[in-house]
Amino acid sequence: MGWLCTKFLSSVSCLILLWVTGSGGIKVLGDPTCFSDYIRTSTCEWQLDSTVDCSSQLLLDYRLLFEFSENLTCTPKNSADTVCVCQMAIEEPIQADTYWLELWSERGQLWQGSFKPSDNVKPPAPDNLTLHTNVSNALLLMWSNPYPSNNFLHKGLICMVNISREDNPAEFKVYNVTYTEPKLSFPVNTLTSGVRYRARVRVLSQSFPGIWSEWSPSITWYNHFQLPLLQRLPLGVSISCICILLFCLTCYFSIIKIKKIWWDQIPTPARSPLAAIIIQDTKVSLWEKQTRSQESTKSRHWKTCLTKLLPCLLEHRVKKERESPKAAKTKPLQSPEKAGWYPAEVSRTVLWPENVHVSVVRCMELFEAPVQNVEEEEDEMVKGDLSMSPENSGGGFQESQADIMARLTENLFSDLLGAENGGVGQSSMAESSSLLPSESGQASTSWACFPTGPSETTCQVTGQQPPHPDPERATGTACTQVPLVISDNPAYRSFSDFSSPAPNPGELASEQKQAGHLEEGDLLSPVDPHSSGPPMQQAESWEQILHMSVLQHGTAGSTPAPTSGYQEFVQAVKQGASQDAGVPGVGPSGDTGYKAFSSLLSSSGVCTDTAAAGTDSGCGGYKPFQNPVPNQSPNSMPLFTFGLDMELPPSPLNSAPPNSTPECLGLELGLKGGTWLKAPPPSEQVPKPFGDDLGLGIVYSSLTCHLCGHLKQHHSQEEDGQIHVVASPGCGCCYDEKSPSLGNLSGTLESCPGEMSQEANLTLAPRTPSNLSGVGKGPGHSPVPSQTTEVPVGTLGVTVS
């Protein structure tokens, strides 16, 4: 019994061991993956749970599910340790073909199932990939179609071209080709020039579901092409900038090297052991000086270097550049007629080594004198009266001779103005006249003409009379117009702004007495350079006499408030017109302004006196403007000279003959406007200076415009509607077409009886107040009512001889 139990237990143990062994064999993980190239091959893959030798342990059986089909066997291969692949050869497939598959191992069947080739198509990889570069500016890739032309998928494929850099595969470009032709063309400039690229291609079926084929064998090439201009421009600019920088650095270091070799060897005063001696400081005005800080900031190193080489040229030019901004601020605008220049001496420095002679070069430079307007000139004139007093004028005479002459001349006219207003100047001028020595044997005749009425001009004879006077000398007067000869000087530009009130009859009487006193005194009569007489010896110079007069009467008298000379003259003309309105042909019309003065000129230009019996020609009598010597050249006759800066008086040979009669001078006057228009006189009219620098033809022009030659006038609003006013194109002066000009006055001069000879000369007259006047009467004339007209000082003071 025991034996039977033991046998049963042994059988059960064997069964259990067999079951365990059978259950521990190969196991398939999931369904296999099968695809077909749709030509002649189908492929299946299996994933196993353990490492298996596919060719020895597994076997695949397949057959087409069709009648009378046979079984086919495929031996799998290991694609990996746990993957088995089996490629099955099939007939040319069609869309309806289906295959039955069974996977067997040594122990039994592992898997079974069906597969349809049209459900999963994987085309084969393309081949024969080539690159063509003969296309202009493009690359051409070509490959072969994996399907034959009779295949259904020959025209149903999609191609993908991958182009990547050989050195960096991550940088690539993909082109999809959907057309049937197996080629791709793309521009060469889409790729970077100078880089090696690699290309490959794969295909996909469009007619059946499937997957991408494997990549075709790749090809490589070197991409190179010429860059366009826009792409080459940044590179060219960069290279150019680098080249320019290198060139500049090369030049800079070369110049520095040359400077050390050549420039630094030039001797300079800064490194010289010689001693510098300053001979004379720069004499410039306050506005031309600058602080050392400004000079140091504005000076440049290269200018300093050039100044060392060319001191006389570049140093002046640098100085002008420094002074031009400040001069433009301080100096007002100046017309071309007012341009004045004065010399200024530049400082000189001499290097004085031992036993070495160094020559001194004197450099002169011209600076433009500042011109002030009328208001500033009036303020400076008032300040000049105080600064030129005897206690303040001591230091002024230590300056240059030109400054002394300008100050003395200005103080002289200030003294004349004070004498006109306060009566002190008459005695001073008498004293100064007495100081002038007169040479024996010479007779000096001076005529001072002033308007004493609205229709006549009175002439007074001062000085010594000829030894044999003619009784017919003063028989009558004839009015003669003399053209103006005007000279410009900045020192006398504002004297007409000062005018004195109209003198009363008592003052006129005192003035006539003073004139008589002046007739008795001896006058200085310089010798005419054309005469053959001996020259006159002067005890004292003209400047010393003038300086003594300034010191004696500089502070005497008080000047009244300045008024307009033109306004006083218009009032005087109106007053004369109201008094003489009843006399026809004598008094001016009732008009105002320039028309009244024009009527005064026309009335005074007519001869009112008749010559007595026995005269030679014309009105007869003494003619002061006629030269008895016919061959002597005429001299210029400047008017409005204030008794200054005239030519040498003629010799006794040039005096007037006794049978001539003095003629009244009809002066051509212009009215002073708001702006002073001055121009230098013509060269033939400027008197020749004599003595020192003071005789420079200082003549003031306040009435006549030198640009157009007409009398200055300014019409009021009521006159604009009555008289046709014409504006001169040169200066803008308004003048009447009927008003006289310089040319008209010259014609009037010829038409008056007793024509003035061209050899008439003007001599130096005594310094008398400009409003001193007298009434000249002839024996054959009836008294004509006259009235002294108040005229601004400096506008009507005329002396002739």
From Swiss-Prot:
Domain spans labelled Fibronectin type-III: 125-223
Residues that carry a glycan: N71, N128, N134, N162, N176
Modified residues (Phosphoserine): S164
Processing and modification events after translation: On IL4 binding, phosphorylated on C-terminal tyrosine residues.
Motif extent (Box 1 motif): 262-270
Location of the protein in the cell: Cell membrane
Keywords: Cell membrane, Disulfide bond, Glycoprotein, Membrane, Phosphoprotein, Receptor, Secreted, Signal, Transmembrane, Transmembrane helix
Biased composition (Low complexity): 426-444
Extracellular side: 26-232
Polar residues: bias regions: 454-465
GO process terms (BP): cytokine-mediated signaling pathway; defense response to protozoan; immune response; immunoglobulin mediated immune response; interleukin-4-mediated signaling pathway; negative regulation of T-helper 1 cell differentiation; positive regulation of chemokine production; positive regulation of cold-induced thermogenesis
One annotated GO molecular function: interleukin-4 receptor activity
Region called Disordered, residue ranges: 424-476, 493-515, 767-801
Bilayer topology annotation: Single-pass type I membrane protein
Motif (WSXWS motif): 212-216
Pfam families: IL4Ra_N (PF09238)
Origin: domain of life: Eukaryota
Chain positions of motif ITIM motif: 698-703
Known tissue expression: Isoform 2 is expressed in kidney, spleen, lung and liver.
Ranges where the record places region Required for IL4-induced gene expression: 549-644
Main localization (coarse): membrane
Assigned protein family: Belongs to the type I cytokine receptor family. Type 4 subfamily.
PANTHER family the record matches: CYTOKINE RECEPTOR, INTERLEUKIN-4 RECEPTOR SUBUNIT ALPHA
Record remark on domains: The WSXWS motif appears to be necessary for proper protein folding and thereby efficient intracellular transport and cell-surface receptor binding. The box 1 motif is required for JAK interaction and/or activation.
Protein's recorded name: Interleukin-4 receptor subunit alpha
Highest classification ranks of the organism: Eukaryota, Metazoa, Chordata, Craniata, Vertebrata
Gene assigned in the entry: Il4r
